[in-house]
Structures are given as C-alpha cells and as structure tokens.
C-alpha cells in the first residue's frame, strides 16, 4: 500500500467492518517494515486489500476486505495468493488468520487455499459478538 491508497482503504474499512482501522493506524503501517498491505484497484478505487504482518518467520493476516460491488470476482483470492507468495519469499514458514465463525464464503476460500482450522477464539468479535475460527497454512519447503 502506498500513500495514495490510504483514503480508499479507510473507506473500505468503514464499509466492511464494524470496528474499522483508523486512518492514523493505517498510516502507521506504512512505516512498519513488518507490515504489508496489498491493494486491488478497479474503476479508479480500492476494490479490495489484504494486510499482513510478519514476525519471526510467521505471517499473520490482519485484514481482508473486498468492496461488496466487487465481490465474487477473485479479488480476495488474488490478494491472498500475492500475500502468500510474499511471505514465502521473505522466509515465512506459515500464515495464519482469524475469521468470523459465520463467514462461510471466506472460510471456503481459505480452505481452498490450503488453510486448516486449528482453533477457536471465543467471543473474539463484537457488533455482533461472535467466535473467531483460527486458520493456519504451513508452507512447503
């Protein structure tokens, strides 16, 4: 992500999440060498993005969002593939995330990409309160 996409990512955060990241938090990620935000642009706007933080050989997906009007076009899957390739290139051995237990479309995508459910975080989300499924994928070496 570059400075030019901050506004679009902020808008997408507000569209997709009940507790969106602030513009300040997103700007701080620009200066974080361990953070990588990969944006997809369509029709002149940020159509989707994925955020990843890498720490000691592990990649953690912090955010995945695709604008409702651009869903079902492969944008999320392409960003996920790009995030995985980058994590492997930088030496990560696994990638992990949390997803709402009720988010069946997202869970299906992650399973298609080789993620496995490895645990649950009770009441992880609010508005509405919901458990998170923890999903992890180990990279072949």
Task: Show the residue positions of the predicted features.
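C-terminal "cap" of GNAT-fold acetyltransferases
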Residues: 93, 100-104, 123-141
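Conserved GNAT acetyl-CoA-binding A-motif
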Residues: 87-98, 109, 121
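Acetyl-CoA-dependent GNAT
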Residues: 3-69, 80-82, 86, 90, ...
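Short, solvent-exposed loop/turn elements at beta->coil junctions and helix N-caps
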Residues: 26-28, 121-124
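ABC family nucleotide-binding domain
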Residues: 70-71, 111-113, 118, 129, ...
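Residue-level recognition of the GNAT/N-acetyltransferase active site
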Residues: 53, 67, 71, 98-102, ...
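Conserved acetyl-CoA-binding loop-helix of GNAT-fold acetyltransferases
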Residues: 66, 72-86, 104-113
């Amino acid at each position: 992500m570059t400075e030019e996409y901050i506004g679009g990512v902020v808008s997408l955060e507000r569209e997709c999440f009940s507790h969106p990241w602030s513009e300040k938090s997103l700007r701080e990620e620009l200066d974080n060498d361990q953070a990588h935000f990969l944006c997809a642009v369509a029709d002149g706007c940020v159509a989707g993005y994925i955020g990843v933080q890498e720490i000691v050989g592990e990649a953690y997906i912090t955010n995945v969002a695709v604008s409702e009007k651009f869903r079902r076009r492969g944008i999320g899957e392409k960003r996920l593939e790009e995030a995985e390739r980058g994590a492997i290139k930088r030496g990560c051995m696994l990638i992990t995330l949390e997803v709402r237990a009720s988010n069946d479309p997202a869970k299906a995508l992650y399973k298609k990409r080789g993620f496995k459910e490895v645990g649950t975080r009770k009441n992880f989300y609010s508005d509405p309160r919901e458990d998170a499924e923890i999903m992890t994928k180990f990279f072949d070496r």
